[in-house]
């Protein structure tokens, strides 16, 4: 499932009605970074190289995060949710739910290594809802681009670098 992404839901800063607060302690936070800091880490050097080449001031980029946020080409980040089974066959309250937790934890432990062009800045396993599920928020990016910033946000190119074809 691909969604808009709600970091507040994932970190439980906001708690939905279907959450069992007594089981929230069983949730797993794999990572949680501030997205603006992630953008600085990933793109500041590329932005500086890009700006150094510009002859026109109006083409310079002051803040790449804001450029992407205001633009229509790319999204700031993407979220995917992984779940095994449903509330009937993998309920978080029983042994099958614990099996799902182990599988999803192992999956997450290897996700970044398998997907080097998807920078994971937030990942949370929820055990306090009916079915265990994993939220992964990531910034898709590429390096070595010939146009614009040499390191930039691009879901299509990041997935192509991972071997996925399509448009």
Indicate where each model-derived feature is located:
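N-terminal nicking endonuclease/strand-transfer module with a His-rich metal-binding environment
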Residues: 1-167
């Amino acid at each position: 499932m691909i969604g808009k992404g709600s970091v507040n839901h994932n970190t439980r800063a906001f708690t939905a009605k279907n959450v069992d607060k007594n089981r929230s302690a069983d949730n797993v936070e794999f990572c949680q970074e501030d997205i603006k800091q992630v953008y600085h880490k990933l793109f500041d050097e590329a932005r500086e190289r890009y700006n150094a080449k510009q002859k026109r001031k109006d083409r310079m980029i002051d803040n790449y995060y804001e450029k992407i946020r205001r633009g229509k080409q790319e999204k700031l980040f993407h979220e995917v949710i992984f779940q095994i089974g449903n509330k009937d066959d993998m309920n978080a309250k029983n042994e099958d739910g614990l099996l799902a937790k182990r599988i999803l934890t192992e999956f997450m432990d290897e996700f970044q290594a398998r997907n080097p062009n998807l920078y994971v800045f937030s990942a949370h396993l929820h055990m306090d809802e009916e079915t265990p599920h994993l939220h992964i928020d990531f910034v898709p990016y590429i390096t070595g681009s010939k146009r614009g910033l040499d390191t930039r946000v691009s879901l299509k190119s990041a997935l192509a670098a991972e071997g996925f074809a399509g448009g």
